[in-house]
Each structure stands twice: as C-alpha cells, then as structure tokens.
C-alpha cells in the first residue's frame, strides 16, 4: 500500500525492569530484537508504549494518549457535532453512523467521532503504529471518563483494501479515509510524527484502489480527508467538498443517512 520505505532498524526496550516481561511479549509479537544498535526503539514504560528515534538530534517519543493532552482538550473543547469532520461523516441530531476508519494512524479522528457517539472500526496496516494504537486503547479503557468512548473503538490490523474486499458482516454506513499524502511542504518535515513514521510507512500510492474498495463497501457514504490544495483522489469524483483552512473533506454520498 506504500512506496518502498527506507530500511530502518528498530529494537524493543523496557524502560523499567517491571515492564521487561511485557516488552518481551511485544518483541516476540512484532519480531523485534531486544538488543543492538538501531535507528529507532519501541519502548514500554509506565506511560505505555512509545516509538522513539535514537540519536542526538532526534525528536521526542510518540505514543497514543486518549486520556490527557490534545485528545482530552479536543474532547472537552473541540466543538462537538459542529466540527467539520462530524458534518462530513453525517453526524447530526439523532444520527450517529457506524463508521470504518480504514486509515486509522494514531486514531485521533476516530476518537473524535467515537466521543460523539459513533461506533468505530479502525484499520491500521503498519504493525508498529497498530501496536501504539492498541496500547493507547487499552490504557483508555482503564479511565472512567474515557472508557465508554474507547469501548466504541474496535481495532483491526491489516491491509485495508484486502479487509474491505473480504468484509464479513454488516457493512459500515460510512468509510473514512485519510491517506498519507506525499508531502512537499518543508514544514511537514519538522513534524515529529511524520519524521518518525515515514521510514516505516512511506506514502500511500494506491489511494485510488483504497477509494474504490471503500465505495464498493460503504452503504451510505465515503469521506476522504485531503490537504486543502491537494487534488482529489483519482477515480470517482466527490459529490461535494467541505473545506477548512488547511484541509478539506471530499464526500462521496451513496444514500441518505437517517435516524433510528
């Protein structure tokens, strides 16, 4: 699903001795060495699982945290159902669609929609990112306030196109896509997460196939998040567009969403 990412080396570390056993299980599951000189490390500590680049000028670690920080702020002050993403997927009075986020990443958008009451299924194809997301969801389930939101988020790991083409059970009403765009803007290079993930993920170059699979599966609509000035994904044209300052949502309607 990507161009060929550069060959980055990574090991598994336990930051405290009492996490050694759990770190060993992650290492076995992900096929990571426990020792050796590497470019990156997946670390397990008291704050959970985190990915960090090693070296003098490396940025800090990245972890998934749905309880505190940016996720908590957006949950409390983010604008609720008036947010553009909510409008794009069809959230309105009496309507909370079942949504598949086929490009979950660190789960931020899925968490926003789950916090608004949507039942979410998430797909993440990169095992390291999926591990961070799984760990973040497990910690969220331990928080009294956030646990009901996390309970609405189900994580699948694998190739989104394959999973959508072989979908079992009731189809999602809405499929949400946020393909990693080949960034040319130099400012994007300084973003910590982009810098960390690019060696493992690369750019999504088969977005047209992803969109086609989504359109075939979704019962009501497909929504694609894009940089504001980026072209639409090749293939079917969006029915309408919601545009913000830096990004936009291309909406492909199939059927009107109705309340229960």
UniProtKB/Swiss-Prot annotation:
Entry keyword annotation includes Transferase: yes
Catalytic activities: guanosine(1516) in 16S rRNA + S-adenosyl-L-methionine = N(2)-methylguanosine(1516) in 16S rRNA + S-adenosyl-L-homocysteine + H(+)
Residues annotated to bind S-adenosyl-L-methionine: 108-109, 124-125, 178
Single annotated GO MF: rRNA (guanine-N2-)-methyltransferase activity
Pfam families in alphabetical order: SAM_MT
A single Gene Ontology CC term: cytoplasm
Principal localisation: cytoplasm
Keyword Methyltransferase carried by entry: yes
Cellular localization per UniProt: Cytoplasm
Keywords: Cytoplasm, Methyltransferase, rRNA processing, S-adenosyl-L-methionine, Transferase
Residue spans crossing the bilayer: none
EC identifiers of the protein: 2.1.1.242
Top-level enzyme category: transferase
Functional note: Specifically methylates the guanosine in position 1516 of 16S rRNA.
Record-stated family: Belongs to the methyltransferase superfamily. RsmJ family.
Protein name: Ribosomal RNA small subunit methyltransferase J
Organism: Ectopseudomonas mendocina (strain ymp)
């Amino acid at each position: 699903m990507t161009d060929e990412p550069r060959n980055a080396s990574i090991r598994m570390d336990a930051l405290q001795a009492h996490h050694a056993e759990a770190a060993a299980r992650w290492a076995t599951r992900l096929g990571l060495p426990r020792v050796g000189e590497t470019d990156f490390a997946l670390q397990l500590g008291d704050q959970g699982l985190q990915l960090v680049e090693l070296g003098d000028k490396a940025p800090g670690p990245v972890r998934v945290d749905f309880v505190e920080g940016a996720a908590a702020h957006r949950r409390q002050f983010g604008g609720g159902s008036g947010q553009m993403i909510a409008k794009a997927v069809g959230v309105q009075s009496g309507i909370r669609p079942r949504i598949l986020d086929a490009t979950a990443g660190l789960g931020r958008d899925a968490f926003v929609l789950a916090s608004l009451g949507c039942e979410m299924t998430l797909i993440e194809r990169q095992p390291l990112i999926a591990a961070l997301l799984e760990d973040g969801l497990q910690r969220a389930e331990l928080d009294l306030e956030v646990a009901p939101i996390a309970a609405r988020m189900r994580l699948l790991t694998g190739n989104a196109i394959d999973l959508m083409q072989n979908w079992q059970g009731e189809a999602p009403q809405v499929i949400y896509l946020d393909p990693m765009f080949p960034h040319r803007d130099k400012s994007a290079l300084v973003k910590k997460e982009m810098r960390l993930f690019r060696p493992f993920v690369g750019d999504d170059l088969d977005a047209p196939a992803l969109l086609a699979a989504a359109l075939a599966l979704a019962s009501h609509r497909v929504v694609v998040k894009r940089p504001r000035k980026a072209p639409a994904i090749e293939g079917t044209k969006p029915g309408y567009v919601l545009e913000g300052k830096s990004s936009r949502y291309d909406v492909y309607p199939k059927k009107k969403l109705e309340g229960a």
